[in-house]
Amino acid sequence: MEKSNPTLDLATKTALLTWQKSNALLQHGIERATPFVLAVKSKAWQDAQSIGSKVAEAKFRDIDRTEITTITSVALGLYFAYVFCLVFYRLYLHPLAKFPGYRICAACEWYEFYCYIVKGGQWGNEIRKMHEKYGPIVRTSPWELSVRDPAFYDQLYVTASTRKTDMWPRGREGNGFDNSHHLSVSHELHRTRRKHLEPFFSRQGITRIESRIAERVMKMDDRLVGLKGSGSIIEVDHMLCALTGDIIGQVSSGMEAGLLDDPEFTPAWKDLMIKSTAIAPLFRCFPWINKFLQSLPTSIMNSVYPKGISNMMLGKTGQQNIEKIKTQIATSKRDLSDVSVFHHLLSSNVPESEKSIDRLRAESMILLLAGTLAGAHTLTFVVFYVLQNPQIEKRLRAELQPVFKGYPNKMPTWAELEKLPYLRGCVKEALRLNGLVGNLARCSPDEDIQFHQWVIPKKTPVGMSIYAMHFDQNVFSEPEAFKPERWIGEYNKQMDRNFVPFTKGSRSCLGVNLAWAELYLASAMLFRPGGPKLVLHDGGESDIKIARDYIMGFPKAGAKDVRVKIE
């Protein structure tokens, strides 16, 4: 390095040494360097300063490369040491270390990501394999357990009088519904929020608005009657998503969405629902992604990750409805609390924090999503399996004949229809075959839970699968078959224990009564005597059977939609 420097005269060398010494002194905080003051003012000093800087820079480059390499090595070493210690702790020292399961699941969450995202919705299937290998309780992540034992269901999903039940915080992160009643973490907050919603969703509350549900069901029938004899082919799930979307829109906000009015039954609504559900596992694995996407302008999000826009659009729909309701309440001279769920909430004396846009937007999103997709999927199963078997269709139509004698002047009521055993069997079989696949994790915040010889520590998330309950071969003969008659007459009462489409306990589905009402009314209308004749157009059972787990169950990739021809 010295050879590359220009030749220095004696004065310059002296000044250079002076500069270096002065710098060293100043570096150590010595401000009084009197012998060097005159040198600083000299021309030689200025030249030396320039040369010294070049020498220092050259030395710094050498030091920089060395130090960067050293720092990088140390950082990597510390990181790998941290990972090693973390994995060691999770495998051998963690409170859940005694529970069986794949070692990779105990060590990290990446296997769940791999099964959900890379393998395409196979996490539920992988949990099933773990249970087959290790038994009724397995560790599915560093923090979470899964149980397969129907007798334990009522001990896990308990009422508030038995034990407090919290939501697992990590299980709700990233989906944008955090402020909804369903995903409220603490038992107390969930109970408070749900209490204000229950009057609208009680049996009495749904009976009071049953005429609104019936009006939408009759509108669907009018659309089908208009196509009678035309040979038109329609997408069943588009039509049924439009129906359930119109119903939940009316119940939640009193708004007339008009999804059934669209000639194609508003396929964009069904696509929005599917995308919002299918993206949930990604947000569960990486909660920050949704928060980041929500901060982007719509145009940028649409180009970066088009699927991510679904949650944004769903949230905007809910927010617009809530803002309209606030305006209606502010300008109306009469009490609007009985119009819809959000009219009721915004007119009540709940704390103002519970009336915020962010809070109610989350509530609206989950009501629209669950209220649309769950009911539509179940009705699609009813349509497919009834039409697939002429004997089932014939028996169902015959049972409906007496209650539809007065139609269209008199529509059969929910109370009348639920008494029909074969219709009830058809609805229950559709619910059974269409159960949620993913585990619904619950935490006991204050008490350990005993499961056989295992003691599950308090605050540990434990989940069970509705789908596994519904396909238990020890309870349901031919569990994959659609057999309405299995629910008629004398039958194995363990079927009632295992039948949990709306789960149980203090966090059971809020909309259970709404779901029953629309399932009975819509199923009966689709197969009423004198109605349009529906014929399956193409596809088979493999196009509807659940093969993928995105929280809700989905058919195989590339499956055809259920389509019917109207004769």
Curated annotation (Swiss-Prot):
Transmembrane segments: 68-88, 366-386
Record-linked Gene3D superfamilies: Cytochrome P450 (1.10.630.10)
Sorted UniProt keywords: Heme, Iron, Membrane, Metal-binding, Monooxygenase, Oxidoreductase, Transmembrane, Transmembrane helix, Virulence
GO molecular function, one term: heme binding
InterPro entries: Cyt_P450 (IPR001128), Cyt_P450_E_grp-I (IPR002401), Cyt_P450_sf (IPR036396), Cytochrome_P450_monoxygenase (IPR050121)
Record flagged with keyword Heme: yes
Enzyme Commission numbers on file: 1.-.-.-
Record's GO cellular component terms: membrane
Main location: membrane
Induction trigger: The botrydial biosynthesis cluster genes are co-regulated by the Ca(2+)/calcineurin signal transduction pathway, which is under the control of the alpha subunit BCG1 of a heterotrimeric G protein. Expression of the cluster is also positively regulated by the cluster-specific transcription factor BOT6.
Positions contributing to heme binding: C509
Localization, UniProt: Membrane
Catalytic EC class: oxidoreductase
SUPFAM superfamilies xrefs: Cytochrome P450
UniProt keyword Membrane present: yes
Biochemical pathway: Secondary metabolite biosynthesis
Knocked-out gene: effects: Abolishes the production of botrydial and accumulates high levels of the biosynthetic intermediate beta-acetoxy-15-alpha--hydroxyprobotryane and small amounts of botcinin A.
Pfam families assigned: p450
Membrane topology summary: Multi-pass membrane protein
Cofactor dependence: heme
Annotated S-S bridges: none
Family: Belongs to the cytochrome P450 family.
Described purpose of this protein according to its UniProt entry: Cytochrome P450 monooxygenase; part of the gene cluster that mediates the biosynthesis of botrydial. Botrydial is necessary for colonization of plant tissue by the T4 strain. It is a strain-dependent virulence factor since highly aggressive strains like SAS56 or B05 still retain substantial virulence when botrydial synthesis is impaired, since they produce also botcinic acid. The first step of botrydial biosynthesis is performed by the sesquiterpene synthase BOT2 which catalyzes the cyclization of farnesyl diphosphate (FPP) to presilphiperfolan-8-beta-ol (PSP).
Name of the featured protein: Cytochrome P450 monooxygenase BOT3
